[in-house]
Amino acid sequence: MLPPAESSTPDVTSVIPEGGLSTADLVVIVLYLAAMMGMGLAIARKQKSTDDFFLGGRSLPAWAVGISIFASLLSTITYLGMPGEMFRTGVAFLTRQLPIPLVLVVVWGLWIPFFMRLDLTSAYEYLDRRFNYAVRALAAIFCLLLLFGWISVVVLTAAGALVDIAHLDIGWFLGTNDPSTGYRDADMHLVIAAVGMFSILYTTLGGIRAVVWTDVIQFLVLMVGALFTMGYIAYDTGSGLGDWVSHSLATKHEEVEWFSLDVGNRSTVFTISIGMFFWFICTHGANQVALQRYFTVRNVREARISYLVSALASLGIGVILAGVGVSLAYYIQDHPLDASIARNQSTASLKQLDDTLEAARNNDGQQAAETIAADQSAQRRELRKTLNKAQDSIFPQFIRHYMPPVLRGLVVAALFAAAMSTIDSGANSTSTILTVDFFRPLSRTQATEAGELARARYLTAAMGVVVVLYTLGLYHLSKGTNIIDLCQRGFNCFLGPLGATFMLGMFSRKVASTHMVLAFVLGEIVGVSASYSMEFFGAPFSTHLIVPAAWATTMITALGLLLVIPQRPSPEQLRWTRRAVLADEHLDSPAAAQPTAGPSEPAAD
C-alpha cells in the first residue's frame, strides 16, 4: 500500500485566521431566529381548523407558494452541496439544469391540471380512489420514510456547517473529542438536537401559512447570503466572474463523460440529466411536500404560476450557487483552509495511485494492473471519503475563517434559512399524512376541528423527536459521504416507486391494486439495493440512476403482472384515470371527489 502522496501545497495552516462567530454575528442570527418564531406565533393565533393548518384555506398567493415550493426543495443540501459538487466536477455539474424545460412540459401540462381537479389534502387520497386503501397506506408510509430521511439529511448538513463555522469544541470540554475524525461527535449531537427541535417548535405554531410566508423570507435571506459571498470574494481579490470561470475551466476536475454504459460511473451528462428529470417529475407528481403547496392555491391557473415561479427560482439559484462554487475555488488559491489542504492532498494521493496503476498496465500487463487495483481499492475509498468531506467543508470553513463579522452572521442565517424552509415543510407534510391518511380513515369517531388541530400540532412535535433520533443515526452511518450522494442514499431511494404508482394510476386502465402493491414493493427493494450497492454487492451504482432504476422497475413489474394476475380495476376505480378525471364535469364540486371506500370496506377490484 502506498503512503499518502506529499502535496505540493506548503504547510500554511498557521496563517489561516482563527475566525468563528463574533458577538455581532450572534446578534444577527438571534434576530433572524426570533423573527421566524414571532411570525409563527402571529399566524398561529388566526388558525381555527386543520384546513387552515394544512392548506391555508386554499387561498395563498401563487407567487409566494411558488417561492415556498422552491425554498422547501432547496435546503442546505443544495446550498452546501452544489458548491461542493462544483469543486468536484466544475461547471459540468450545471448539466443538472438541462431537463428543466422538459420537466416544465410534464408538470405544467399533465400533473397540475389533473391534481387540481381532485380537491385533495393528502396526495395519497387519490390512490385510495384509483386502487384501494392498501395502496394508499403503503405509499403514505414510504413517503413518510422519504420525508424522515430528507429532513434528517437537511438537519445533518446544517449541523455540520454550524460546527465547522462556530468551532464549538464541546467534545473537548466533555473529554470525548476525537481530533482524527474531523467532525466532533459531541458537538454534532448537541447541534443536531438544537437545530431540529427549534425548527419543529416553530413549525408546530403556524401551519402551512407560516411555512409559506417564512419560506419567502428565508428565500430572500439565502439569496442575499449567496450574492454577498460572491461580492465579498470579488471585492477582496479584485476578480470577477470571468476570472472564476477561466480558473475553473483550467483546473483539472473529475471527468464527466457524455454517456457511459457503466452504471457504476457516478456522473455522466446523460445520468445527471436523466436523474434530475425523474427526480423532478416524481417529486412534483408524488411527493406530499410539493403537491400540498399546489393545493393551497385557488385553481389550475394559480398552481401553474406557482410552478413557473419555482422553476425560474431553481434556474436562478442554480447559477448563483455555481457562481459561489467557482468563486470559492478561485479564492482558496491564495487563502488556505484546512479543507482545501486536505482536498489537495487527497487529490495528489489519488493521482499517485492512478499513475502507479497506469505504469503497471503499460509495463506488466492488464492482469498485473488488476491485482494492483484490487490492492488499492480500500485506500482509494478512504481517500475519496476524505476528499468528499473536504469539498463539502470548504464553504463553511470559508465563512468561518475569512468572512467579516455581520456578513458572516448573515450567511449563517442563510444556512439556517435553507434548513428551516425544508424542516418546516417536511414536518407539516408528515403531520398532514398522518392525520389525513391514517387517523381520519382509521378512527371510529370523528374528531372536532379544535381536537384535530391540536392533534396535528402534537404530531408535528412528535415528528421532531423522530427526526432528531433518525439524524443522529444517519450522522454515524454517513461519515465521509458527499452531501449529494447522501441525498440519494438517505431518502431518494424511495421516490421512484411513488412516482410510478401515481403515473400508473393516471394512465393505465388495466393495472389494479394487487399489481400495484407487488410492483411497488419490488421497486422499493431495487431503490434501496441500488443506494447501498457497494455494501450489498461490492460494486458501485451511480447515485443519479437510483430514482430512474426504481421507477422503471415499478412500471415494468406492474405491467408485466397483467399477464399473470387477471385482476382488473372496477368501473368506480376507472373514474380516477387522468382522462376520466379531466372529462368529468362533476368533479368541480368537492363532494364529488370524496372516496367511496375506506380501509374497512375496500373498493371492489
Task: Enumerate the language-model features and the residues they cover.
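Membrane-embedded helix-loop-helix hairpins and adjacent transmembrane boundary segments
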Residues: 2-605
